[in-house]
Structures are given as C-alpha cells and as structure tokens.
A protein has these predicted regions:
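Secreted/extracellular ectodomain signature
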Residues: 14-120
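Classical Sec-dependent N-terminal signal peptides that target proteins to the secretory pathway
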Residues: 1-17
Length: 120
C-alpha cells in the first residue's frame, strides 16, 4: 500500500511537470490571438513587438490548444526595443481596461521581433 502511495505521488509530480506552460505555448496563443483580429504578427515590419494580458491562473491544455488572449498590444516599425515595449504594453493595457479584465490578467511582453520575452 505504501509503495502504491509513493507511485501515485511520483505520477502526479511527473504529470505536473509535463503540464507546465512553455514560453512557446504563450507565443502560439499570442499569434493565434492576433490572427483572430486578422493581424499576422509574422508579416509585420521589423522592430515589432507584442504584449498580451496573460491569465496564468486559468491557462490549461485546452486554452493552450484553442484559447485566445482578450487583451493584446503590438507595434512595428519602431525605433528601438524600449519604444516597442512601451507601444505594445500601452495597447494591451487599453484593451485590458476596455474589456474590464484588470483582475484576471496582467499585460506582459511576449515578443520583440522573434525574441521571446515571456517571463514565466
């Protein structure tokens, strides 16, 4: 019985590790969310940036496969990374307030050009 208990704990620990959210998952959700608004991030001009209001507490396997972020911000043709971050985060914050989701997520940087900036 004790062996069975430890085995079940080990299985649960491994399942949790496999269920962790990868930065690439966040990027995929971000790009899917942009496509929802008919914007293809990959074809935007260089010096582009993207931010999203990421609901970390509610992201599950289904959300990773099908979900979209409600609030997004992006910019392109921007002078440098600091201006790119500012543009993306400000746009995301505007959508976050407009959709009244201030308590469910926080706007965070996702991409600058093709560099992943997610802090998971």
């Amino acid at each position: 019985l004790l062996l069975l208990y430890f085995l079940s704990i080990n299985i649960n620990i491994n399942a949790s590790a496999d269920d962790s959210i990868k930065n690439e998952d966040i990027v995929s959700i971000f790009k899917r969310s942009m496509n929802h608004w008919k914007i293809n991030y990959d074809t935007l001009d260089e010096n582009k940036s993207g931010a999203a209001c990421i609901p970390w507490n509610t992201i599950d396997k289904t959300f990773i496969k099908e979900g979209i972020f409600i609030a997004l911000g992006y910019g392109f043709n921007l002078y440098d990374i600091n201006i790119a971050k500012k543009a993306a985060l400000e746009g995301c914050e505007r959508m976050r307030r407009a959709n009244k989701i201030e308590n469910t997520c926080k706007c965070e940087m996702v991409l600058y050009n093709d560099d992943i900036l997610v802090k998971n």
